[in-house]
Amino acid sequence: MVKEYSVSGTALTGEDLEARDVTIIVTDGIITAVEEEKNVPEQWICPAFFNAHTHLADTVAMDIPCTGGLEELVAPPNGLKHKILRQTPKNDLVLAMRDTIAEMINSGTAGFADFREGGSEGVSALQQAAASLPIHPVILGREGGENIADGAGISSARDVKDSAEIAGRMRRAGKIVGFHAGERDFEDIDLALDAAPDFLVHCTHATDRQIRRIADEGIPVVLCCRSNFQLQVTFGSSNPPIKKMQAAGVQILVGTDNVMFIQPDMMHEISFIHTAYGVPAQDILYSATCGFPPAGLSHAIKQGN
């Protein structure tokens, strides 16, 4: 049975978020028409968010008081988060992640890319958590989990000695590869770039030369600015060097990172970036709603999406 509905208002349409008065017709989850209208309700229609970097398993650690920086809280294998994950039963993990996914949906997020710890069992837990929910998960595993996931999410080329081999294997399998890079310093960015990733996360301390290389190689960068401040890897608007990235032509995406201390609310994330870094509202809104190019996902309001 065909399911069709329509919604009218002022919509931010296409790849450039052009504001148009339209009626949008959706058939079986696909936009089949975007029709110009003269009289529409006074409401705005915005493309859904895509959260381009999450660690949803951290949900189980949300209520635990924690202080410290990157190494103490989230660095593998002995950061607080990893100790908690190892002690958490799988069923508890699934239920916690499912609750967080529901919150993401309620705040306008239609997809996410998760770096999933815990090998194949960890990937399986997130697959179960997202099952039947109206959201598109891109799951990137590690420690063998990449073999049953959408690809690999590598913590750092500095820490994972066979990261280049993993990246090559993923490419041959037609899967996605993402790297944490440049979160605490610039030293692992070139190592990650040498592996020809589909995207990088953070690049908080990217140098001018590295920014130029990232732009030349057409590699998107996912910013997680609230997390950078929380983990004390930055203390000002120069890091990550967003304006330099924009000037160089780097494609910028937005993620919220670790759920244990950052709510996966994309509106809060882009509001922070707009305010703290002075990024124009339209630019950062586009970064948060364009979808996930590494997986070929577009969230633009246009026919066929």
Region annotations inferred by a language model:
Residues 59-94, 190-191, 217-223, 273-279:
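Active-site gating loops and adjacent loop-to-helix segments of metal-dependent hydrolytic enzymes
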Residues 72-122, 161:
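Divalent metal-binding segments
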Residues 111, 137, 177, 220-221, ...:
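Hydrophobic beta-strand scaffold residues
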Residues 115-192, 198:
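Metal-coordinating catalytic core of metallo-dependent amide/deamination hydrolases
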